[in-house]
């Protein structure tokens, strides 16, 4: 049924207002809407004053929806972007879900300029020269129709000893918020100090990580850092480059060590494994972990 389909529309215009308005990229049936898609636009663009991707009627039909931009290619080449600076949702109030990638006259604009471009660190731009192509624009995105990603999440400390004794889901009441406000996403109260007390972990660890359920589905670019680690009250030194963002989709993990995970392949920040065990992560009375969630989406190096 054509009436049930969601039309995906592109607006892209340069500083002279020339470009394409409501260019139909594809019409998607409801049963095919959720998931990852690649949209292709064939044309030219010298720079972008307006750059939006619209899903006609989707915000009205699926009010609990979210669209994440995974990749943008210009003439076949991927470009960098900071999706934390995009705007998402029914921005115009007409039931249309919009991802506003750049708009000098749109949400968040000041004086017909974008205060901080998602495509560079240039401030107060009226147009974005990074968006230019001679033949083709490709946008890879993921559509989620059963959740916006906003809400309260719980970071759980997980540690497992060599005998598979475990603390699985200890959080001491910790929680943080993914806030959706003014059509943007942000992290609220995202710095933590969790202390776990036990006498069962002196032999070391085969797994130690912080885990957040369900969030990876929405924000696979979520980034956190381990700020400090204390074992039995003493601060431990470590190689911060080896404490890694990882996933057990739809769960996110800040992985200190996992004999089945990413750190098994890339090396442990705390020492050399003895088989599967990192003895340096052992403790006789307490483990205290201080960590911070920084961004929901990956931040490029400009």
Language model feature labels by segment:
Residues 39-65, 114-124, 134-136, 191-221, ...:
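Extracellular beta-strand ligand-recognition surfaces/modules
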Residues 91-93, 113-147, 248-251, 256, ...:
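A charged, solvent-exposed segment within the mature domains of Sec-exported extracytoplasmic proteins
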Residues 13, 17-44, 83-112, 166-199, ...:
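Extracellular carbohydrate recognition and processing domains
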Residues 1-4, 37-45, 70-73, 78-79, ...:
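Extra-cytoplasmic beta-strand recognition segments
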Residues 62-83, 149-151, 221-236, 299-302:
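Exposed low-complexity, polar/acidic, P/S/T/G-rich flexible segments that act as propeptides
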Residues 3-11, 50-55, 148-159, 205-208, ...:
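Beta-strand acidic-aromatic groove motif in beta-rich domains, primarily in extracellular
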Residues 2-3, 17, 58-66, 145-149, ...:
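Extended, low-complexity, turn-rich repeat/linker tracts enriched in Gly/Pro/Ser/Thr and Asp/Glu
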């Amino acid at each position: 049924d054509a009436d049930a389909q969601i039309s995906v529309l592109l607006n892209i215009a340069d500083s002279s207002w020339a470009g394409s308005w409501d260019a139909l990229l594809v019409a998607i049936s409801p049963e095919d809407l959720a998931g990852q898609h690649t949209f292709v636009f064939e044309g030219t663009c010298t720079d972008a004053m307006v750059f939006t991707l619209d899903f006609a009627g989707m915000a009205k039909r699926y009010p609990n929806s979210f669209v994440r931009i995974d990749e943008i290619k210009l003439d076949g080449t991927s470009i960098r972007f900071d999706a934390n600076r995009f705007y998402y949702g029914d921005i115009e109030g007409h039931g249309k879900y919009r991802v506003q990638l750049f708009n000098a006259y749109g949400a968040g604009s000041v004086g017909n300029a974008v205060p901080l471009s998602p495509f560079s660190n240039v401030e107060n731009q009226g147009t974005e020269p990074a968006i230019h192509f001679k033949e083709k624009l490709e946008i890879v995105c993921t559509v989620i129709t059963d959740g916006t990603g906003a809400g309260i999440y719980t970071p759980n400390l997980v540690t497992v000893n060599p005998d598979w004794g475990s603390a699985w889901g200890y959080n001491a009441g910790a929680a943080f918020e993914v806030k959706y406000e003014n059509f943007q996403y942000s992290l609220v109260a995202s710095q933590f100090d969790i202390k776990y007390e036990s006498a069962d972990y002196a032999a070391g660890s085969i797994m130690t990580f912080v885990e957040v359920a369900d969030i990876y589905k929405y924000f696979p670019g979520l980034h956190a850092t381990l700020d400090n680690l204390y074992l039995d009250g003493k601060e431990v030194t470590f190689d911060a480059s080896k404490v890694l963002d990882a996933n057990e989709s739809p769960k996110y993990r800040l992985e200190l060590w996992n004999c089945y995970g990413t750190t098994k392949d890339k090396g442990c920040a705390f020492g050399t494994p003895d088989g599967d065990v990192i003895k340096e992560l052992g403790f006789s009375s307490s483990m205290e972990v201080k960590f911070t969630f920084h961004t929901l989406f990956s931040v490029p190096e400009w």
